[in-house]
Amino acid sequence: MESKSILEELLLKKSQQKKKMSPNNYKERLFVLTKTSLSYYEYDKMKRGSRKGSIEIKKIRCVEKVNLEEQTPVERQYPFQIVYKDGLLYVYASNEESRCQWLKALQKEIRGNPHLLIKYHSGFFVDGKFLCCQQSCKAAPGCTLWEAYADLHIAISDEKHRAPTFPERLLKIPRAVPVLKMDASSSGAILPQYDSYSKKSCGSQPTSNIRYIPREDCPDWWQVRKLKSEEDIACSNQLERNIASHSTSKMSWGFPESSSSEEEENLHAYDWFAGNISRSQSEQLLRQKGKEGAFMVRNSSQMGMYTVSLFSKAVNDKKGTVKHYHVHTNAENKLYLAENYCFDSIPKLIHYHQHNSAGMITRLRHPVSTKANKVPVSVALGSGIWELKREEITLLKELGNGQFGVVQLGQWKGQYDVAVKMIKEGAMSEDEFFQEAQTMMKLSHPKLVKFYGVCSKKYPIYIVTEYITNGCLLNYLKSHGKGLESCQLLEMCYDVCEGMAFLESHQFIHRDLAARNCLVDSDLSVKVSDFGMTRYVLDDQYVSSVGTKFPVKWSAPEVFHYFKYSSKSDVWAFGILMWEVFSLGKQPYDLYDNSEVVVKVSQGHRLYRPQLASDTIYQIMYSCWHELPEKRPTFQQLLSAIEPLREQDKP
């Protein structure tokens, strides 16, 4: 017996082109919606003819409007789409009222359907690709969040299946969490209580009734508070954090919904996973490797997606080609690069394509790692200066000379690579030394070089910091600059600006910002280093004592005239650094000595636009060189100015 009709209307239908040679035509059909199906019929002389097609309601996954194509005729001004298990149907209503009526009726019937789409395609599929995102597979995952999903998706809400605010695997503390005593309590949000093992109770009974509070001053560390007495600090790196929220499902992060937590792979364990590296940085690293099939996997700029970046070099092609492939999810929540080869996880997908190109330019042959043998956050500083044991540090080779002594590559505990700044006796006072150590200890940001500890019981004093693989930015620009594109140079400036914005927000002044004092990491991100001249000031201004050395060519007028330092003098220096980057390491004011630079700058002379800098980029660096400090932008404003220029670099 046929179900009762909910809605009937004569609508225009676009051919679904299920076959490659099918014509792209439009026909009027009588659409009939019932509780179980959406069917369409021939219609002639006010009579329903034979049925031409039907879609089961339970198979429909999305019903939504479609953006108009260019030069759309009058009769096709109100399109909507029906995405179902076996295809995609475009239908045109006669007016907006009719379209809204159909959308409302269809969405009401599909409410609670399995496999409803979180994202859909807002553009038509035309000439073998979606107009909205240029994806060429008709079954490709959507690019636009479907707003109706939240209302139509029926979540499992009974107590048996409801996800807790913080799932059980949120905080999983190993038996040997390093702990450091705290004198005073810290305020913050209180997390659920879990059993924990402190260093004292390791191997005995677990310590219960513990609260975990994220520390605002150091995001890598959480406060561990006993409900009754003492406080400890536990490193958040060793607390397995897996924040569950309604908006971020397993599927949205590239894992099938059906997979259990045991099956979810930790991608950071794989050498080929580069995390949040940018498109331009991945291209530079792959070209540096220069091997056919060099590859890495990175987070895409599209939330929850991954991209495989792959290098190939044809005969007589000196530069080579880098292709970027999105990892897609099909209707069964399987992952794929090539549609016919689907897998449950990213590692399985990569393993397959390491042996089969399957539609890619070449197979994945040589993983390019951005990982270095760094000290994990779990053993870095939490609170107070950490006096390291000198005998645990092996010096390997000299890296260079700093203001206060030699910098060496070292190995800590025979395991971790570190940089060791060796302070000569008499090079600076102990007060200066501990001021630097305390300053560095308070700074924790991805774009600042990490401070690990000190050896201060005898000379030479050691300052032990993060080892940055590719050395100083200035030398990197000189040796690799010709292979860098403008967008990659801009990314370097943005990294430095991020680090400086952090210093600015904490009222720290660097006082010696330049390309020579920034370092290039293994993933080509740039970190700000050398805080030997940094001071903490409450009024954001520090007046230097007369006779103090300072780098004239990077100094603002108020520095070389009045010895006044502020965040705005750092901004001036950042403008010079941008000039260094876009001139690939040239010396600023190379035709003048220091005394001539003072005269020229005081007269209003400024550096010229480097050839690789666009007018817009030059305007940004030029804004840093305003004679009046208050007229210069803040680092936060500089970030906002640079950000739109980076958009073109996103995949």
UniProtKB/Swiss-Prot annotation:
<feature type="binding site">
    <location>
        <position position="121"/>
    </location>
    <ligand>
        <name>Zn(2+)</name>
    </ligand>
</feature>
<keyword id="KW-0130">Cell adhesion</keyword>
<feature type="domain" description="SH2">
    <location>
        <begin position="272"/>
        <end position="368"/>
    </location>
</feature>
<feature type="modified residue" description="Phosphotyrosine; by SRC and autocatalysis">
    <location>
        <position position="542"/>
    </location>
</feature>
<dbReference type="InterPro" id="IPR000719">
    <property type="entry name" value="Prot_kinase_dom"/>
</dbReference>
<comment type="subunit">
    <text>Interacts with BCAR1, CAV1, MYD88, PTK2/FAK1, RUFY1, RUFY2, STAT3, TIRAP and TNFRSF1B.</text>
</comment>
<comment type="similarity">
    <text>Belongs to the protein kinase superfamily. Tyr protein kinase family. TEC subfamily.</text>
</comment>
<feature type="zinc finger region" description="Btk-type">
    <location>
        <begin position="113"/>
        <end position="149"/>
    </location>
</feature>
<dbReference type="GO" id="GO:0007155">
    <property type="term" value="P:cell adhesion"/>
</dbReference>
<feature type="active site" description="Proton acceptor">
    <location>
        <position position="512"/>
    </location>
</feature>
<keyword id="KW-0963">Cytoplasm</keyword>
<dbReference type="Pfam" id="PF00169">
    <property type="entry name" value="PH"/>
</dbReference>
<dbReference type="InterPro" id="IPR001849">
    <property type="entry name" value="PH_domain"/>
</dbReference>
<keyword id="KW-0053">Apoptosis</keyword>
<dbReference type="GO" id="GO:0004715">
    <property type="term" value="F:non-membrane spanning protein tyrosine kinase activity"/>
</dbReference>
<feature type="domain" description="Protein kinase">
    <location>
        <begin position="393"/>
        <end position="646"/>
    </location>
</feature>
<keyword id="KW-0727">SH2 domain</keyword>
<dbReference type="GO" id="GO:0005524">
    <property type="term" value="F:ATP binding"/>
</dbReference>
<feature type="binding site">
    <location>
        <position position="133"/>
    </location>
    <ligand>
        <name>Zn(2+)</name>
    </ligand>
</feature>
<dbReference type="InterPro" id="IPR000980">
    <property type="entry name" value="SH2"/>
</dbReference>
<keyword id="KW-0808">Transferase</keyword>
<keyword id="KW-0479">Metal-binding</keyword>
<dbReference type="Pfam" id="PF00017">
    <property type="entry name" value="SH2"/>
</dbReference>
<feature type="domain" description="PH">
    <location>
        <begin position="4"/>
        <end position="111"/>
    </location>
</feature>
<dbReference type="InterPro" id="IPR001245">
    <property type="entry name" value="Ser-Thr/Tyr_kinase_cat_dom"/>
</dbReference>
<dbReference type="GO" id="GO:0035556">
    <property type="term" value="P:intracellular signal transduction"/>
</dbReference>
<dbReference type="InterPro" id="IPR017441">
    <property type="entry name" value="Protein_kinase_ATP_BS"/>
</dbReference>
<dbReference type="InterPro" id="IPR001562">
    <property type="entry name" value="Znf_Btk_motif"/>
</dbReference>
<dbReference type="GO" id="GO:0005829">
    <property type="term" value="C:cytosol"/>
</dbReference>
<dbReference type="GO" id="GO:0006915">
    <property type="term" value="P:apoptotic process"/>
</dbReference>
<keyword id="KW-0547">Nucleotide-binding</keyword>
<keyword id="KW-0863">Zinc-finger</keyword>
<dbReference type="InterPro" id="IPR008266">
    <property type="entry name" value="Tyr_kinase_AS"/>
</dbReference>
<feature type="binding site">
    <location>
        <begin position="399"/>
        <end position="407"/>
    </location>
    <ligand>
        <name>ATP</name>
    </ligand>
</feature>
<dbReference type="InterPro" id="IPR011993">
    <property type="entry name" value="PH-like_dom_sf"/>
</dbReference>
<keyword id="KW-0862">Zinc</keyword>
<dbReference type="InterPro" id="IPR020635">
    <property type="entry name" value="Tyr_kinase_cat_dom"/>
</dbReference>
<keyword id="KW-0418">Kinase</keyword>
<keyword id="KW-0597">Phosphoprotein</keyword>
<keyword id="KW-0829">Tyrosine-protein kinase</keyword>
<dbReference type="Pfam" id="PF07714">
    <property type="entry name" value="PK_Tyr_Ser-Thr"/>
</dbReference>
<feature type="binding site">
    <location>
        <position position="143"/>
    </location>
    <ligand>
        <name>Zn(2+)</name>
    </ligand>
</feature>
